[in-house]
Amino acid sequence: MARFDDDQRRALHEQNRRSWNAATEAHNSHKHDQAGFLKRGGCTLFADELELLGDVDGLDLVHLQCNCGQDSLSLARRGARVTGVDIADAPIAFARELAAETKLPATFHRADLFDWMATSDARFDVAFASYGTIGWLCDLDRWARGVRRVLRSGGRLVLLEFHPLVWSFAGSGALAKPYFLDGALDEAGVRDYVGVDLAPSGHLDGVQEFANPERSFGFQWTVAQILQSTVDAGLRIETVREYPYANGCRLFEDMTPLEGRRYGMPACAPAMPLMFGLVARA
């Protein structure tokens, strides 16, 4: 596992911050009346994370890498006392505006997650992260230690992510790069990935042909690295799941649409894990 000093870490994460700031307007341009959707009782969460989370009513929950806060506010509606943390300015500004407009109670912090977890005095019953989160972080061990620090004794980490195996394949489904990769992957920037299935409030054409002017850096963690970092941080793994479908995201061409805004592998392809879930207790 590659190691980065604090200066390198900040440089990598700050570049990702700029890239996410550049992409946020394009992402939200495709989502119709998000505040109205939430005020009417709408929920942006998928059944799988709700099943892993269980009943959150009355719990203190930190949403790690919360992006624009739609899922955070969906959890607040379910009774959780929600704190959201994200490195990028534009998503946090949007989340705060959405919370004010919906009158759903949640607190949002703009910070590098590593810095925030190392210094926050707050403690939580649940630390939650989902869909495209840990692949933006340059040190998985530091992430897991930070999660352990902000959890109360008996608190839970709940993680639902795209399976690391999928990043070895191109959109065509052809094997494109090794599963085992070390170091930072220099990429073209956060893309505009928001389609119909990521806009439950209603999809709009919005920004067309978005090209991000800011590059980004990704990190390809294996399942073993994720589990080992969790264990090494002192968290006790309780649940591990693999799913043969992807929520809200057409990862490959010709994927099969399924109920619940899911996609399965193309009919001509063998089944493979497309997401995984993890619950670990402090």
Locations of regions flagged by a protein language model:
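Conserved class I S-adenosyl-L-methionine
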Residues: 156-203
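A short SAM/SAH-binding and catalytic strip from SAM-dependent methyltransferases
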Residues: 125-141
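N-terminal, positively charged/glycine-rich alpha-helical extensions of SAM-dependent methyltransferases
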Residues: 1-35
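A short acidic, Gly/Pro-enriched loop at the edge of an enzyme's catalytic core
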Residues: 114-127
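Short alpha-helix
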Residues: 217-240
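Conserved alpha-helix/loop element of class I SAM-dependent methyltransferases that forms part
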Residues: 32-60
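Class I SAM-dependent methyltransferase SAM/SAH-binding core
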Residues: 59-116
